[in-house]
Amino acid sequence: MENEITKLIDEVKQFTIDRDWDQFHNPKDLAIALSIEASELLEAFLWKSPEDAKTEKIKEELADVINYALLLADKCGLDVAAIVREKMIRNAKKYPVDKAKGVATKYTEL
């Protein structure tokens, strides 16, 4: 899996290098772009039931979100697999199965 993540990062980086876009990719602007793409993902669901959302639009916007997240992590020198695992460990402590299973309650209210 980690090898696949590294390959994806390399592919996305090469895409931007080939177009000389890397000069525009600083952490601030990548975070802003990620947020904008996340909003476009939300737009796929706006005024629709979840079942009516268009799968192709979701795939397109989700790919943009992931691409910017990968670029941001790389630009900040972060290991994507490691930070996801670290966050899952923190989440497991905040949301123990015996208290959080089947409920949508925030950890501060469990």
Where are these regions (language model features)?
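Flexible "arm" and connector segments at domain edges
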Residues: M1-L110
